[in-house]
Amino acid sequence: MQIGIIGAGKVGCSVGKYLQENDALRKAGYHITGYAGRRKESVEEAATFTGTTPFYLLSELVKKNDIVCIATPDSQIKTVWEELCKFSLEGKIVCHFSGSLSSDLFTGREKKGVSACSVHPMYAFSNRFTSYEQLNTVKLTIEGDPKAVAVFREIWNLCGNETGVVSTGKKMQYHAAAAIASNLMIGLYAKSVRLLEDCGFAGEEAENFLRPLVENNIRRMLESSPEEALSGPVERNDAETVQKHLQTLQGSDRTVYLALSEEVLSVAKKKNPQRDYRELERLLREDRRQ
């Protein structure tokens, strides 16, 4: 099956290069043909980088390919789809790579004879020409029509990547989970740095003090489980310390501490099912109501 990519940015270049270089994929009959996009220069750079063809007309890319991948920014995907609908799409598979948008974006696809899906690599692309080198370790989540999902699972599994399937209705929740693990964790770290700065630590000094703690805890969690890695006042049922923390924190710092302590309490209960956390649970619940 021939695969064309619309969009020659970080995602388009990285995915195209990675798939193009995979021998198992080529042997299975999948081939990247080339790129189309708004900027001629970017399209030509992507085609040269991947050893494929620059398509200067969208109609030519559509005509040439069985699978059309939209690798544009989220705000442009709907517009690209509307442009695609001007051409014959019968029997084709269309996908986009947005993490937050679902295949519902491809309105009217049934009438066009299209099978569609969204494919989201759990990875933060940082460079058009080097990010592909890390894609062999990336997991991907696929959502959409059964035929399209099956084809893209085969494509990525042939490359050795693990894939998961999420329902259309859960796509935004899935993306929120990824954002919490990736983006919001950075915000949490930045908040900790700022609190230490308020205690008199300089910015770099605060980070140097926190770094071993963060690295060791994340390593333990990833190598074992959240339950095994968990320690601290909530885990050991130290309601007095938790109460003092809440008394010293203000505003959003206090709100975040309270919300995450409730989540950590759920983990602590799994780790220590014999321990009575009712006093701590009552403290967090009553504090949240204030």
Q: What are these language model-derived features?
A:
Residues 219-275:
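Interdomain hinge/lid region at the active-site interface
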